[in-house]
Amino acid sequence: ETAEQICDDLKENLIGKDISRGKAEETIKDALRLAMLDVMKQEKLDLEGGIKNKNGPYLIMFLGFNGAGKTTTVAKFAHRYKRHAPVIAAGDTFRAASIEQLEEHARRLGVELVKHKYGADSAAVVFDAVKHAAAKGGRLVLADTAGRSHSNVNLMDELKKVVRINEPDLKILVLDSLTGNDIYDQCRLFNEAVDVDAIVLTKADVYEKGGAALSAAHTIKKPVLFLGVGQRYGDLKEFNAEEIVENLLK
């Protein structure tokens, strides 16, 4: 679908255009660049402004499939926005060791963590984290959630409940850049379930070309905020569409 859109735009840009001898490759490349940038066209999301202007804690909820890198992304956000006194909500009460993993991140980062027991209601964990942040004057709550899959209807229904009860200010879909064509289905599944607001692509350092960004942005027409480019807390890079397109054209 993304490729078809790019081809259509490319035809539109080239049909009827005079192409000088020896300039064909350059002209096609320029037209392709424009077509890909058009596919990734997105509204700028002012996350910093949203946090500052919210009357109370700004709630960001992280969603995604198992293994996409949600928990690490939560930690990276806590590091990046530490000046807002973030509180982490251990909303994944399903996966073994998920709470301990977040506890370790919170300890290293020097931020607070709100947790319940395994099997507890995720919606209640997030609710308590927001309440705790408000009482402490924290400006930001970062909520981890259990990894979903196509087949697990119960977990998807639970996610809808967590969103419905807590009304997050921002729902971020965390996607693995190495996913391949399955990225279409993941984008649609989550967007149809909870109306995703933005995207973070992980493992972008492993697959540097950036085709996943092109597919994700086009599939659900939502902005890509950051790329995960390593395992360190600071390895969260602001998304740059022009840079991605240049990588794809190399």
Predicted regions and their residues:
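Primarily NTPase-proximal linker/entry elements flanking Walker-type ATP/GTP-binding cores
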Residues: 1-91, 98-118, 126-133, 140-143
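Conserved catalytic-core segment of NTP-binding enzymes
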Residues: 101, 121-135, 150-250
